[in-house]
Amino acid sequence: MDVNKVLQELKARPGFTDHVGMMLVHNGVVRGWSRKDHAPVSSITVSHDQAKMDAICHEMEQRPGIFAIVAQANEGDLQPGDDLLLLVVAGDIRENVKATFAELLDRIKSEAVIKQEHGPEA
């Protein structure tokens, strides 16, 4: 998961300069605490459904003004601070990109990524 590489690859695509005025990036990392109750987290186990992620991205790339979407997720046992999820939405104007980005993030997190947190005693 290399944010700079992904951005460079998007910029190199034919039509980029004709269709893109903004890119939004989400680089999710493992927290050292649980969102639910702020209990300490020493690691998490992550799995994802790549086919589902790809389908969501393809669906959302059909929206007005969206040029491309990239979604990558790490799997396995991860520690606090490790990269977990990388999302990039490239499109024409902020109104189109922001709305798509917000829904993309929510859908991928709820439909395609499964996380199990482990506390210090695990």
PLM feature segments, named:
Residues M1-L84, A90-A122:
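N-terminal, polar/charged subdomain of small-to-medium soluble alpha/beta proteins
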